[in-house]
Swiss-Prot record:
<dbReference type="Pfam" id="PF02228">
    <property type="entry name" value="Gag_p19"/>
</dbReference>
<dbReference type="Pfam" id="PF00077">
    <property type="entry name" value="RVP"/>
</dbReference>
<dbReference type="InterPro" id="IPR036875">
    <property type="entry name" value="Znf_CCHC_sf"/>
</dbReference>
<keyword id="KW-0695">RNA-directed DNA polymerase</keyword>
<keyword id="KW-0479">Metal-binding</keyword>
<dbReference type="GO" id="GO:0075713">
    <property type="term" value="P:establishment of integrated proviral latency"/>
</dbReference>
<keyword id="KW-0167">Capsid protein</keyword>
<keyword id="KW-0238">DNA-binding</keyword>
<keyword id="KW-0229">DNA integration</keyword>
<protein>
    <recommendedName>
        <fullName>Gag-Pro-Pol polyprotein</fullName>
        <ecNumber>3.4.23.-</ecNumber>
        <ecNumber>2.7.7.49</ecNumber>
        <ecNumber>2.7.7.7</ecNumber>
        <ecNumber>3.1.26.4</ecNumber>
        <ecNumber>2.7.7.-</ecNumber>
        <ecNumber>3.1.-.-</ecNumber>
    </recommendedName>
</protein>
<dbReference type="Pfam" id="PF19317">
    <property type="entry name" value="Gag_p24_C"/>
</dbReference>
<dbReference type="Pfam" id="PF00098">
    <property type="entry name" value="zf-CCHC"/>
</dbReference>
<dbReference type="Pfam" id="PF00607">
    <property type="entry name" value="Gag_p24"/>
</dbReference>
<keyword id="KW-0511">Multifunctional enzyme</keyword>
<feature type="active site" description="For protease activity; shared with dimeric partner">
    <location>
        <position position="478"/>
    </location>
</feature>
<dbReference type="GO" id="GO:0004523">
    <property type="term" value="F:RNA-DNA hybrid ribonuclease activity"/>
</dbReference>
<dbReference type="InterPro" id="IPR003308">
    <property type="entry name" value="Integrase_Zn-bd_dom_N"/>
</dbReference>
Length: 1461
């Protein structure tokens, strides 16, 4: 009494010695049902009672708990009686249930009398197998508090230690889990952690699948407390407060173990082990195939494959995976890690590894001779005295002080002996089933067998079955085979065979191999005594003789792959003579992309290290660079990408000898024996000359640019170089050409690095294969043995499957039927359909319907909604893909062609008579023309079929079936001037009549009545008359981009009309002509016949094509073209082409000229308003164009553009030095002007005498651009004598000075931005910019060059200068003054007197008047104080008063040059 009950400090108390774990778990589970929980004292008393009970003869298996309860003494301490009572209630017995065990009473009460003893009380009843398992469900008393406690690591370790020796799903395994679940009450997450800690990923995946199934059934059935709105059961079970749902989830979690493979038998694919010499990729491929064939549907394959790829690998691969940390990584990482171990570059050797002989010295444990100390049976002596009791005869772990004191047992009802049996542990030999040979036995070592790429480990052995004489045979050594296989021919007489299921690389089979349970003796050449096997596999097809691991283990043979110590050597393939860089251009220098992500940089370094080890690259320090970067593939592996676009741009493209991939249907059925050869890393075997390394160099950067990068260059031909495929094809063709000559009856198909051999006999195929492999190996081309395939069976080549009489694609696309597609999705599915279209029985109209859905979309994320017609096309293509198949060529049968012309395209079929499948389906779109005759399409299709069949099959089609009627074809040949008429006449003897049915059972897939039905538009629309129709009216029509007009005439003009085209659209003359013809045909609709006269060759050709039957293609005028056939339907038409603008007096030319005049608009002269709106010229220019001074002033003042720009009407003026005649002195400057976010340089040159301007638009202000601008100004104005500029660097450069000297031009400089020295050119800059701003304000999209030319036209030739009344161009090109003879006096100029002021003086009084010597634009020459001097107009005033009628002109004369230059 007074014991404290609580949780046990350890998860699972240790079982008493001698009691099985399964029985102990039953006791513990019953104990944990007590409330309150049992204490350590209760477990100690239970262990004490069970130790005593184990010594009684009543202890049986299974235990009779009723009989065991009778052994409990009265007043036994603890709660042992309650635990046994729980077990009694739950035990199922065939007899009547035993009476409950009386509960121990207190000493104060009187116990009831004991029952009378029975003579058979100690004899247990006969055992009957219980109907239910002895496992209890998880049960908690009602109202008990939650016992949930998260796992700790010591708890998980204790549970894993308990289940480590039990099988998955066994009673011991399940009882341990139930006890742990009942004690800790875990949540769903805790159970998932426990499962991942105890089991492999394979078991976790299978358990997860079964648990989801049970949860779905439970949620459907309904559970107490389950709320579907609160989330799934797994989420609700994670809540510690949801005790009821958590217990339901715990029961489902335990029940999910009932269907795992460990409960009955491990699946066949779980026993696939990697052989000692088997490449890792081949082992993974066997696992993949086995899982595909044996895994239940819906089970995720990836985690199972990843788990088995590590656990079932050999020790060498497991060590490599552990070292790289890839024990549970993605499969791609594991394959890449073990790729270096693949025995493709190793020498395969078979050796016998005997046990070492025992030493001659005595064992230091027992002192005897003849064994190693590790095999000694004596226990290892302790190193010294025990640290606890100082006794040297035992270890510390065996010290008696560490053992609890043995309490004296209370007397039981029976006095039994205390001896107990001892259990001896089983000592297993090191190495499993391998038995070491006797020391006296001679050691046999197998001689080294070098294995090349084309050889297999084959030995000559002798096999004896059932004691018969040994028979010699050749056997294959295969470490991947679990059992030895012999052919049935070695078994004498009938024997009893057993069915068995064999799983290999090609899948499961239960017919070819049988199990032979008869002793078998195998005599090996390196072993004296035979290998004896109790059973083996029997090959009923007599193809295989294989020595498996069961025989190799007995002889202690080992296949291993020794490392090749030789360094990497470049394989002896010839160096190419030409690669396209013989002209040695400067190597490209492209900066490396930033790669600061640690993952990408690490992947790039790993890839470079592997390439460096393989000898594909080497350190480099020369010029040239192309960027590199890694790309992650879908399988998780990284791929090295070298961006060689810069190198490809300077490389000369070599002509490829390959015309493209071959059509595999051309393989004749007379070549049934096939074999494929796949080359690995083929490009990396072609050496690259040293002089080309700068073009293929790259840099590996340091992280965060902490240091200079590492430079490398390729030593072999890299991938990504545009001439690499061509060079490799040339090298491979040179290797295979001798084989083609040696075997003329065989065929060698070569495309890139894939090779297919086809021979008429198997013997010839073996010879061809051996010589081809030898030639490839000799030339240094590595061969992938894993991808080599050979008949019998299907051959996979270039994405297709080759069967004996037909060819299919490896995979056909799965088309989801939905109306909403993105542009990318639709493009991808159409690309997949295009790949398999040659074998899909579908018409072109279905494909064209889907292709048309792509029109108008550019954004890859754009959503496309399919129409009902396009959805129907998807259904039709999905049904046709189920019949995707093509036949192989039969050389004895001719080729036939079937052509179906339709408005959506042409469908062609190449087939042979009486064959099950056609050879090819070809879909051809219509040419991109607005109108194409049907006869031309037929001729083009015939040429396409002849080219295809001649290229792929070596012969032409014997005949063609087509859907063009004989009448339509004859009309086309008789009436059409098309060049294709000669082609059709040449092939007329190969045509069948319309609707003739081709032979072959595949025709039921075509719906031939629909396929060969003649299109309605193929028939002619109207009839052409060769002569003029006297009773029909005449129609004349013509059109322009603005108008369309027609005239209908019959002795008189019946009707004429002019139709304007919409002004907001862009039109062409063809559209106007087509619209005019349509309007005229509508007016002539009542007449059944019509004479049409046109001057448009386009319409004449178009109508001729419609008359002979043509296809209406896509065009910009498709809407108008579609309106023509209904208007012409059934009419008789005479067409006549008229030459325009001939001015001939005949009636046809006269009416044609009259029709043309209806659409011609008269040329209206430019008005002053239009001139100012076009050029924004000044008032005097408008007056010269006929406007009055008042109208000109009003136009300038009311112009919105002129008021917006330069509204002040003021420009800076200055005093400058002017020339005395044109091209005397120029002034130049460079001003900047911003146009559409770009700044341009305007080079401005002004003649100081006439004011003529030249402007050049340049992008820079260099000396070269300045010289170019001067030359352009000279071509416009003439060569100057003197130029004046500022002191800019372009004008002061040596190049510009040399230019001026060579052209004899004097150059001087002035102060920039000074009105007294550079005023003229600065003012001209402002005038030009103002005009440009005005033009661009009126028309923002006006090109800058056009605006500059318009400004020059306005300044030089339109604006009138004051007071000369001439334009700058007139002044600049005015004739020179006649020379004045020395003898004669010069003519006196008309007297012109001016008052003047001197510039720069503060005196405001007018002086003079003086008579002017000469006048120019902006100034007059006066003689002041005896010296001539130019005075600007603003400092001059006429001495004579102006006339009254010219007052208005004088008023505006002073400001016109300021307004507009």
């Amino acid at each position: 009494m007074g014991q404290i009950h609580g949780l046990s400090p350890t998860p699972i108390p240790k079982a008493p010695r001698g009691l099985s774990t399964h029985h102990w778990l039953n006791f513990l589970q019953a104990a944990y049902r007590l409330q309150p929980r049992p204490s350590d004292f209760d477990f100690q008393q239970l262990r004490r009672f069970l130790k005593l009970a184990l010594k009684t003869p009543i202890w049986l298996n299974p235990i009779d708990y009723s009989l065991l309860a009778s052994l409990i003494p009265k007043g036994y301490p603890g709660r042992v009686v309650e635990i046994i009572n729980i077990l009694v209630k739950n035990q199922v017995s065939p007899s009547a249930p035993a009476a409950p065990v009386p509960t121990p009473i207190c000493p104060t009460t009187t116990p009831p009398p004991p029952p009378p003893p029975s003579p058979e009380a100690h004899v247990p009843p006969p055992y009957v197998e219980p109907t239910t398992t002895q496992c209890f469900p998880i049960l908690h008393p009602p109202g008990a508090p939650s016992a949930h406690r998260p796992w700790q690591m010591k708890d998980l370790q204790a549970i894993k230690q308990e289940v480590s020796s039990s099988a998955l799903g066994s009673p011991q395994f399940m009882q341990t889990l139930r006890l742990a679940v009942q004690q800790f009450d875990p949540t769903a997450k805790d159970l998932q952690d426990l499962l991942q800690y105890l089991c492999s990923s394979l078991v976790v995946s299978l358990h997860h699948q079964q648990l989801n199934t049970l949860i779905t059934e439970a949620e459907t059935r309904g559970m107490t407390g389950y709320n579907p709105m609160a989330g799934p059961l797994r989420m609700q079970a994670n809540n510690p407060a949801q005790q009821g749902l958590r217990r339901e989830y715990q029961n489902l979690w335990l029940a999910a173990f009932s269907t795992l493979p460990g409960n009955t038998r491990d699946p066949s694919w779980a026993a696939i082990l990697q052989g000692l010499e088997e490449p890792y990729c081949a082992f993974v491929e066997r696992l993949n195939v086995a899982l595909d064939n044996g895994l239940p549907e819906g089970t995720p394959k990836e985690p199972i494959l990843r788990s088995l790829a590590y656990s079932n690998a050999n020790k060498e691969c497991q060590k490599i995976l552990q070292a790289r940390g890839h024990t549970n990584s993605p499969l791609g990482e594991m394959l890449r890690t073990c790729q270096a171990w693949t025995p493709k570059d190793k020498t395969k050797v078979l050796v016998v590894q005997p046990r070492r002989p025992p030493p001659t010295q005595p064992c230091f444990r027992c002192g005897k001779v003849g064994h190693w100390s590790r095999d000694c049976t004596q226990p290892r002596p302790p190193p010294g005295p025990c640290p606890l009791c100082q006794d040297p005869s035992h270890w510390k772990r065996d010290c008696p002080q560490l053992k609890p004191p043995q309490e004296e047992g209370e007397p039981l009802l029976l006095d039994l002996p205390s001896t107990s049996g001892t259990t001896e542990e089983k000592n297993l030999l090191k190495g499993g089933d391998l038995i070491s040979p006797h020391p006296d036995q001679d050691i046999s070592i197998l001689p080294l067998i070098p294995l090349r790429q084309q050889q297999q480990p084959i030995l000559g052995v002798r096999i004896s079955v059932m004691g018969q004489t040994p028979q010699p045979t050749q056997a294959l050594l295969d470490t991947g085979a679990d059992l030895t296989v012999i052919p049935q021919t070695l078994v004498p007489g009938p024997v009893k065979l057993h069915d068995t299921l064999i799983l290999g690389a090609s899948g499961q089979t239960n017919t070819q191999f049988k199990l032979l349970q008869t002793p078998l003796h195998i005599f090996l050449p390196f072993r004296r005594s035979p290998v004896i096997l109790s059973s083996c596999l029997l090959d009923t097809h007599n193809k295989w003789t294989i020595i498996g691991r069961d025989a190799l283990q007995q002889c202690q043979g080992l296949l291993y792959l020794p490392d090749d110590p030789s360094p990497h050597q470049l394989l002896p393939i010839a160096t190419p003579n030409t690669i396209g860089l013989e002209h040695l251009p400067p190597p490209p220098q492209v900066d490396q992309f930033p790669l600061n992500l640690p993952e990408r940089l690490q992947a790039l370094n790993d890839l470079v290290s592997k390439a460096l080890e393989a000898g594909h690259i080497e350190p480099y320090s020369g010029p040239g660079n192309n960027p590199v970067f890694p790309v992650k593939k879908p399988n998780g592996k990284w791929r090295f990408i070298h961006d060689l676009r810069a190198t490809n741009a300077i490389t000369t493209t070599l002509t490829s000898p390959s015309p493209g991939p071959p059509d595999l249907t051309s393989l004749p059925t007379a070549l049934p024996h096939l074999q494929t050869i796949d080359l690995t890393d083929a490009f990396f075997q072609i050496p690259l000359p040293k002089q080309y390394q700068p073009y293929f160099a790259f840099t590996i950067p340091q992280p965060c640019n902490y240091g200079p990068g590492t430079r490398y260059a390729w030593t072999v031909l890299p991938q990504g170089f545009k001439n690499s495929p061509t060079l490799f094809e040339q090298q491979l063709a040179a290797v295979l050409n001798p084989m083609r000559k040696m075997f003329p009856t065989s065929t060698i198909v070569q495309y890139m690095d894939d090779i297919l051999l086809a021979s008429p006999t198997n013997e010839e195929l073996q010879q061809l294969s051996q010589l081809t492999l030898q030639a490839l190996t000799t030339h240094g081309l590595p061969i992938s043995q894993e991808k080599t395939q050979q008949t019998p069976g299907q051959i996979r080549f270039l994405g297709q499957v080759i069967s004996p009489n037909h060819i299919t694609y490896e995979s056909t696309p799965t088309i989801p039927i939905k109306s909403q597609w993105t542009l990318t999705e639709l493009q991808v599915i159409l690309g997949e359909i295009q790949w398999v279209s040659k074998g899909t029985p579908i018409l072109r109209k279905h494909l064209q319907s889907l292709y048309s859905a792509l029109h108008g979309y550019r954004d890859p994320r754009a959503c496309i909604t399919l129409t009902p017609q396009q959805l129907h096309a998807l259904h039709a293509i999905q049904q046709a893909l189920q019949h995707n198949c093509r036949g192989r060529l039969n050389p004895a049968l001719p080729l036939l062609g079937l052509i179906s012309l339709s408005t959506s395209g042409t469908t062609s079929v190449i087939f042979q008579p009486k064959q099950n499948w056609p050879l090819a389906w070809l879909h051809t779109p219509h040419p991109p023309t607005s109108l194409c005759p049907w006869g031309h399409l037929l001729a083009c299709t015939i040429l396409t079929l002849d080219k295809y069949t001649l290229q792929h099959y070596g012969q032409l089609c014997q005949s063609f079936h087509h859907n063009m009627s004989k009448q339509a074809l004859c009309d086309f040949l008789r009436n059409s001037p098309h060049p294709s008429v000669g082609i059709l006449i040449h092939h007329m003897g190969r045509f069948h009549n319309l609707g003739s049915q081709p032979s072959g059972p595949w025709k039921t897939l075509l719906h031939l009545p629909t396929l060969l039905q003649e299109p309605r538009l193929l028939r002619p629309i109207f009839t052409l008359s060769p002569v003029v129709l006297d009773t029909a009216p005449c129609l004349f029509s013509d059109g322009s981009p603005q108008k369309a007009a027609y005239v209908l005439w019959d002795q008189t003009i019946l009707q004429q009309d002019i139709t304007p085209l919409p002004s907001h659209e862009t039109h062409s003359a063809q559209k106007g002509e087509l619209l005019a013809l349509i309007c005229g045909l509508r007016a002539a609709k009542p007449w059944p016949s019509l004479n049409i006269f046109l001057d448009s060759k386009y319409l004449i050709k178009y109508l001729h094509s419609l008359a002979i039957g043509a296809f209406l293609g896509t065009s910009a005028h498709q809407t108008l073209q579609a309106a023509l056939p209904p208007l012409l339907q059934g009419k008789t038409i005479y067409l006549h082409h008229v030459r325009s603008h001939t001015n001939l007096p005949d009636p046809i030319s006269t009416f044609n000229e009259y029709t043309d005049s209806l659409i011609l608009a008269p040329l209206v002269p430019l008005t002053p308003q239009g001139l100012h709106g076009l050029t924004h010229c000044n008032q005097r220019a408008l007056v010269s164009f006929g406007a009055t001074p008042r109208e000109a002033k009003s136009l300038v003042q009311t112009c919105h553009t002129c008021q917006t720009i330069n509204s002040q009407h003021h420009m800076p003026r200055g005093y400058i030095r002017r020339g005395l005649l044109p091209n005397h002195i120029w002034q130049g400057d460079v001003t900047h002007y911003k146009y559409k976010k770009y700044k341009y340089c305007l080079h401005v040159w002004v003649d100081t005498f006439s004011g003529a301007v030249s402007v050049s638009c340049k992008k820079k202000e260099t000396s070269c651009e300045t010289i170019s601008a001067v030359l352009q100004a000279i071509s416009l104005l003439g060569k100057p004598l003197h130029i004046n500029t500022d002191n800019g660097p372009a004008f002061l450069s040596q190049e510009f000075q040399e230019f001026c000297t060579s052209y004899r031009i004097k150059h001087s400089t002035h102060i920039p931005y000074n009105p007294t020295s550079s005023g003229l050119v600065e003012r001209t800059n402002g005038v030009i910019k103002n005009l440009l701003n005005k033009y661009l304000l009126d028309c923002p999209n006006l090109p800058l060059d056009n605006a500059i030319h318009k400004a020059l036209w306005t300044l030089n030739q339109l604006n009138v200068m004051n007071p000369s009344g001439k334009t700058r161009w007139q002044i600049h090109h005015s004739p020179p003054l006649p020379p004045i003879p020395e003898a004669s006096t010069p003519p006196k100029p008309p007297p012109k007197w001016f008052y003047y002021k001197l510039p720069g003086l503060t005196n405001q009084r007018w002086k003079g008047p003086l008579q002017s010597l000469q006048e120019a634009a902006g100034a007059a020459l006066l003689s002041i104080d005896g010296s001539p001097r130019w005075i600007p107009w603003r400092f001059l005033k006429k001495a004579a008063c102006p006339r009254p009628d010219a007052s208005e002109l004088a008023e505006h004369a002073a400001t016109d040059h300021q307004h507009h230059g």
